[in-house]
Amino acid sequence: MPTPANIAKYQYKDSINRRYWDEKFIYENFKENPVSAAVGGGAATGTAGDENVLMFPATGFEYHILGTQTILAPKITAEGLDLGSMDATADDGLELNHGILSSQIPSFTVGTDAAFYLRARFSIADVSGTDDCVVGFRKVEANQANVDDYADMAALNVISGDINIETIVGGAATVTTDTTDNWADTETHELRILVSAAGVVTYQIDGAAPTTTAAYTFTDGLNVMPFFYLLNDTDLHGSVPLMEWECGYQA
């Protein structure tokens, strides 16, 4: 009897050690309330630039404070982890990732690791309120207040309903390509960023390639990490429940 597709898609490639495959794989559907704390210990804090942790039963995240937050952690709702549940103020937000060290999981080395991917499924209450809503991979480096200040990046960015591809190479200016695909208020979509072993990046929106795309290749030897960067515009984005987050080697 063949292996069911819903099981087979999680099986590791024979060419990759099982322990290493499992170590690089992250899946979270945000059903349980996390424990929050400051990186390094103590209570979570909300000053611009602060870094905190969110610990779920099976996964761990870090979040970097953008602006100033009096609500110190995002909360779980019936839909998922609501990244919009902190302060509703223009230029306030957060970046969600798994830590900024190349030793932290999951990070990937272009040209050394096998092909890898990130998948995020989420909803946006008010798309006109997203100053930036970025999902993708960036260089493993210190968290930045401005997403355009990362040295290298390949991501999808939802701005005022437009789904854009945004890329950065070697600290140069951000290159923005409008996919011409759109996101309406309260809609739920799935974004996927795929990186080949050679660093070639492709994108999917709800399982299909964008209408308009842009070529990009990460530099060989670069360490990259998955991230979600969310920042309020003056109109405010409201609830942004993250329903699924999955990252690892491509099957």
What is the predicted function of each stretch?
Residues A5-H64:
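Extracellular carbohydrate-recognition regions
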Residues T167-E190:
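Short, aromatic/His-centered strand-loop micro-motif at the edge of beta-sheets
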Residues G111-D113, V158, A184-T186, S196, ...:
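Surface-exposed coil/turn segments at beta-strand junctions on protein surfaces, enriched
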Residues T167, Y203-I205:
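Conserved aromatic beta-strand anchor motif in extracellular beta-sandwich/beta-rich domains
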Residues L118-A120, T186-S196, V201-Y203:
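Short tryptophan-centered beta-strand motifs in secreted/extracellular beta-sheet-rich domains
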Residues A8-D14, T217-A251:
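Ligand-recognition surfaces built from glycine- and aromatic
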Residues D178, A198, I205-M225:
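Short, solvent-exposed beta-strand-to-loop segments that form ligand-recognition rims
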Residues L83-I163:
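Secretory/extracellular carbohydrate-interaction modules
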